[in-house]
Amino acid sequence: VSELHGTRWRSRIGGLVLVLVALTLPLVLSDFWLQTGLFVMATAIGAVGLTLLVGVAGQLSLGHAAFAAIGAYVYAWSTGESTTTVSGAGLPPLAGLVLAAVVSALVGAAFSPVAGRLRGIYLGLATLGLVFIVRHLLVNLDQWTGGFTGRSVESFALGGFSFSNSDPDYLAVAGVEFEGLHRLWYLFLVLALVACWLAGNLRSGRTGRAWANVRDSETAAAAMGIGVARAKASVFVVSSAYAGLAGAMLALAYGRVAPDVFSLTASVDFLVMIVLGGLGSVGGAVVGALFVTALPLVLAEYSGSLPFLAAPGSGGLDPSTASRIVYGLAIIAVLLFLRGGLAGAARRLRHRSSRSSPPAGPAPHDPISTDDVGRPAAVTPSRSKETTR
């Protein structure tokens, strides 16, 4: 028991330290790193939603970017003002943020009957179709979306406080002037922490165990009284809501929305994040988002200092191509040597360190166990300790 409590306390202390570091980073980071951090926190929320769907519930999705696009454009339309080229609802930004998640969740709920009838690669192909359908709508419904060029996004404001460089136009903390990027950093940090906390509770609770049973065996889950169709629908709704919120945050970080931002490549990027981080791991999804999102931005920023990189269009190895190569090598390395991703590797290191220490007593029964890749294990009937002759 003491070993279990010690592990939990170490995790909580480590999480608290990370939060404190994140709170102080805007005081020392440049605008480039602040912007990169905004992108990372936004994509991390999308990756967390996808790891619940793919890692915990076992439902393959190649259309996560479509739900993010819905959230981004719903936010842009709902908070924007009508002009001669595009329409807008003029709602408060907070209402637009909530509406982005809700509308994406409703689209996920509408798709859930399809998810209930398909599985595996067939479900993945069905979700892939969403990417092309949504892109077609974004390009052609130009009165609402702005067409190929997209539309601008209103800055976030809450209670008269603007998260841009105005109202108040000057705000300083510890001698550091807090401009729009600094203010958005704390907004995104709060949203990311709440989203990860909710996902962790879902993953370890009754809902997560139901999803895990459906992932492992739909027949066995139905025999245990779990509504398979209801479980699939619920995880699609939750995952879509996370993607919609991530899309709205990306719209705020970019200051503009365009169809090319939410292409098939973006869906693949989300999958790479959760595979590298570890399927079913909330923390792993965050780490994967950090790696996949920050790498191309960092390579582009410092391409002039890296001799093996060339400027885009010059015929050499540009930062985007280099990032794709690194992603591919990283995925191969994870699949071959790090089963369970980075989260699984960290978990094995903790287990080795705990085994090297003297035992504190018999290990308690953990009703929320995990499998060897860190996903919530399905609930299975216990076997009798007696053997038959």
Model-derived features: positions:
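Transmembrane alpha-helices and adjacent helix-loop boundaries
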Residues: 1-389
